[in-house]
Structure formats: C-alpha cells, structure tokens
Amino acid sequence: MTKRFTLLAAAAAFALSGAAIIPASAQDKMMAEKTVNVGGAPMYPSKNIIQNAVNSKDHTTLVAAVKAAGLVDTLQGPGPFTVFAPTNGAFGKLPAGTVETLVKPENKATLTKILTYHVVPGRMTAVNLMKAVKDGGGWAKLKTVEGEELIVKQDGPGKLWITDAKGNTSMVTIADVLQSNGVIHVIDAVLLPAS
C-alpha cells in the first residue's frame, strides 16, 4: 500500500508541476495555432492571408489595393505565398495622391504589378530568409510573383531589410505572421519594381 501511495503521489506531483509529455504532432499544432497581433487584431495561422489581413487596422490601404487589383481570390488560394505587407504608414510615405491614383480602374495593371512585387512564391519564414542571406554571403535575391527580384539583407540579430529594384529599403517590423497559405512579414515601406 505504501509503494502504491508513493507512486500515486509522485505521479500527481509530476502532473501538477506542469510537466507533460505532448506528442510531437500536438506540439506542432499548438505552435501552428500561436497567434500574432498585427494592427490590433490576432492573426490566426488557420486562416488565409486575406481572412487575416482584413482584420488589421494597419493594413486597410493594402487590403483596399488588393481588392482594386482583383487579387483577393489569388491570396485566398492555396499558395503558399510569402507576402511583404506594407502598413498604412508605408503607403503614406508615397507622394501625395499616389494611392488614390493607383486604385483607379484604369491603373489596375500598374497596381497589380506593384502588389505582386510584394509576393514571393513559397513560405519563407524569417529563419529561411536569414539562412538564404547567410548562404548568399550577406544578401539573398528573391524572385517575386511579379517577376523581378527583391534583395534581402540582415542587419543585426533578427533584423531583416528588403531592397527593391529602385534601391529603396524597407525594414521587416513584424516577421513570421503565419497563415494557412503562407506567411506575412510586415514592412515599413512600399516596394517598387523597376518598371
């Protein structure tokens, strides 16, 4: 009886200590469901890029532009996609009237070109990007859905910078916002293709 009590007490102490053995697949699921807040809203890894982006108050301009360009269905698709998502503040850095002009129906092709320049095929987390930079000797080229390239550099631990075809740079301010169909990295400037 004493042995049984001791064994039960030890098992209870182990359980109450919070130490638990969780199968790897359950751990993966728990990590996958970890949310990140962007623009005051939780971003759920079980939702797609559009389902999450529409809830971020910091990305209303981007969402409006995606709708105007007719890219909603694409970004709701299976992907996977890596999206460098400029904030409203990033769009605000463009010359006055630029966004209003771009969302006009007659400028849809130009808007689509700019937006697809922010999208890279595949799921590139910050770890993947930093590895590509390391393997590239300090920088990495990423081919965008638009067809042109972005340059990624690392400046300090975990700080990623994106350079566009015009030489403008944007900092990744929030990395690894996981989506069911890819990953979003929030950036502080709009990236522009060469043409």
Language-model-derived ranges and their functions:
Residues 16-24:
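C-terminal segment of classical bacterial N-terminal signal peptides
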Residues 2-5, 25-195:
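Mature, structured domains of secreted/extracytosolic soluble proteins
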Residues 5-6, 20:
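Generic extreme N-terminus detector
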Residues 6-14:
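Sec-dependent N-terminal signal peptides
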Residues 11-12, 20, 119, 133:
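Generic low-complexity, intrinsically disordered sequence content enriched
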